[in-house]
Structures are given as structure tokens and as C-alpha cells.
Amino acid sequence: MAKTSMKAREAKRAQLVAKFAEKRAALKVIIASPASSDEDRWDAVLKLQALPRDSSASRQRNRCNQTGRPHGFLRKFGLSRIKLREATMRGEVPGLRKASW
């Protein structure tokens, strides 16, 4: 089990990403645009740097919904490999079963 503080930190990051997504995207468009002047581009870079670090989507970490485990995470199910296996063995995941050949 992950610490409660780690789960809370990830929730806060998700909230910040959602809050600043539009602003961040608009600044990136200005930076990437060849039509924008050097001054506009530089201002956009400074504004982007002034945003909170945790508002960047790349700082988010996928975690298991049940345990908070960061490794072995399967996006399709939102669970770690361990919890997915347990749920599969109990028959809680429709259409999923242990491989046998």
C-alpha cells in the first residue's frame, strides 16, 4: 500500500494539471509557432516557467486504484498487475481469465 500522502500528492497533481491545461497549451502554441516574434516567444517561455511544476502532465504517475502501487500499472483496468490477477481469479473481471494452452 502506498502512503496516504503519496495518493494525496497525486490527486493534487491531477487537479493542477486540469486547472492549468488550457493556459499551458496556449503558451506552447505561441512558443512553437514560427509566426510569433522572438519577444512574444520569450515572454511565453517565461510565463510557462512561472506555472507550478506539478501542473505539467508529465509529472503525474499512474497508480493502482486499490493500493496506490506505481509500478506494474495496467491502464485498461486502472489496477496493478497483482490486484488485477486477484480480481481475475475471483471472477470479478468479465471476459478475463488465466491463460492456458
From Swiss-Prot:
GO MF? rRNA binding; structural constituent of ribosome
Q: Which GO terms describe its cellular component?
A: cytoplasm; small ribosomal subunit
Q: What Pfam family does this protein match (any one)? A: Ribosomal_S14
Can you tell which superkingdom this protein's organism belongs to?
Bacteria
Q: Plastid among the record's keywords?
A: no
Q: Please, one GO biological process term?
A: translation
The protein's UniProt keywords, in alphabetical order, are: Ribonucleoprotein, Ribosomal protein, RNA-binding, rRNA-binding
Coiled-coil annotation reads none
Its quaternary structure?
Part of the 30S ribosomal subunit. Contacts proteins S3 and S10.
Family statement drawn from the similarity comment of this UniProt entry: Belongs to the universal ribosomal protein uS14 family.
- Provide the function of this protein: Binds 16S rRNA, required for the assembly of 30S particles and may also be responsible for determining the conformation of the 16S rRNA at the A site.
- Per its record, how is this protein called by name? Small ribosomal subunit protein uS14
Query: Species name for this entry?
Result: Shewanella oneidensis (strain ATCC 700550 / JCM 31522 / CIP 106686 / LMG 19005 / NCIMB 14063 / MR-1)
